[in-house]
Amino acid sequence: MVQQAESLEAESNLPREALDTEEGEFMACSPVALDESDPDWCKTASGHIKRPMNAFMVWSKIERRKIMEQSPDMHNAEISKRLGKRWKMLKDSEKIPFIREAERLRLKHMADYPDYKYRPRKKPKMDPSAKPSASQSPEKSAAGGGGGSAGGGAGGAKTSKGSSKKCGKLKAPAAAGAKAGAGKAAQSGDYGGAGDDYVLGSLRVSGSGGGGAGKTVKCVFLDEDDDDDDDDDELQLQIKQEPDEEDEEPPHQQLLQPPGQQPSQLLRRYNVAKVPASPTLSSSAESPEGASLYDEVRAGATSGAGGGSRLYYSFKNITKQHPPPLAQPALSPASSRSVSTSSSSSSGSSSGSSGEDADDLMFDLSLNFSQSAHSASEQQLGGGAAAGNLSLSLVDKDLDSFSEGSLGSHFEFPDYCTPELSEMIAGDWLEANFSDLVFTY
């Protein structure tokens, strides 16, 4: 510390000619750069009075000169960065002599320039109409919009108050537990005031709980540029409300629900596929309602060979193959279920486009076949597993055919199978070796 103080005194006694002209800018206010006896020792050539140096400036002036002597090509910003890091690493005891020197310079500066007042550099002039709005806080300027140019800060405050009132109106019906209709009414009422200065954006209605009550309306203020998005937000609100209203009344649950078999989450929310019935299905078309379908399925499952009369239609007619005789009793639940599904859906209202019907039928058949394994295994121990596997495999085989069924009945398909493929399909599905299933061309 003593050595630093001595070096500081030695630096202060250096003549001006020994100084570099490049660092004269940093030393214009130091006693080293100018003779302290000169009354203008801290003035620039233009007459601007410089601020007195603080402790860091006193220290960095000395260290900067050392660095510039060692590496004159180093950039000025890099020198400042290194000096800042080194100053932070200095201990407080090492900073004391520089703090004292800075205090001495400050007192001298006050004595020499008693009328000095720190005036920072003025920023570039902005547009005069934008000055009042620039003085507002960001919240007020965002809510007030053009209130700054119209009436200054007071205008911005007024519009922010008015917009908060509007937001309160929106929140009132939501807090009262109103349903989606009340939320829509509040929204349309507030969108009517198109002449207001504020911008109201992104209203969202999110249903809390299971019902439609307790909708919360969020009010978010955006910039002026988002005026065009109001119509989109209104559309988003209606779209988000419609699924909430649909949740209250899931249709056609009682039609598809057998006692203790089908969980409610597997049900579809729209109608069963309306499939036009083919003439060959007239034997089972007498079943009028969906509730009686499951009785027929169970009766067919217990009778075995009796249900086998419908067996030959189910999927084997598509490939023009005769089923193996062992699978006749086992396939009866699946076949009767597929036939009854098509007949019940044909007894509904008029069918829509055939493409949608094919998609719906794919879902219903896959659902029925996956459940036929459970019902069959309960009543037929031996053949139930084979029925489930065979029916599921047949569904996988013919999914592509369902999407093609646009003419006539969905069950009248052309034969797309090659003889080799038909032979494999008609054969045993449970192969002993996996290598038998691999195709080699």
Swiss-Prot record:
The keyword Transcription is annotated on this UniProt entry: yes
Span list, region Disordered: 1-21, 116-216, 240-292, 319-359
Effect listed in the UniProt record for changing residue 116 to C: In IDDMOH; decreases transcriptional activity
Region (Required for transcriptional activation activity and synergistic coactivation of transcriptional activity with POU3F2) location: 409-441
Gly residues bias: start-end ranges: 143-156
Distribution of this protein across tissues and organs: Expressed primarily in the brain and heart, with low expression in the kidney, pancreas and muscle.
Function (record text): Transcription factor that acts as a transcriptional activator. Binds cooperatively with POU3F2/BRN2 or POU3F1/OCT6 to gene promoters, which enhances transcriptional activation. Acts as a transcriptional activator of TEAD2 by binding to its gene promoter and first intron. Plays a redundant role with SOX4 and SOX12 in cell survival of developing tissues such as the neural tube, branchial arches and somites, thereby contributing to organogenesis.
Disease listed for this protein: Intellectual developmental disorder with microcephaly and with or without ocular malformations or hypogonadotropic hypogonadism: An autosomal dominant disorder characterized by developmental delay, impaired intellectual development and microcephaly. Affected individuals may also have oculomotor apraxia, ocular malformations including coloboma, lens abnormalities and microphthalmia, and hypogonadotropic hypogonadism. Some patients may have finger clinodactyly and hypoplastic distal phalanges with nail hypoplasia, especially of the fifth digits.
Protein name: Transcription factor SOX-11
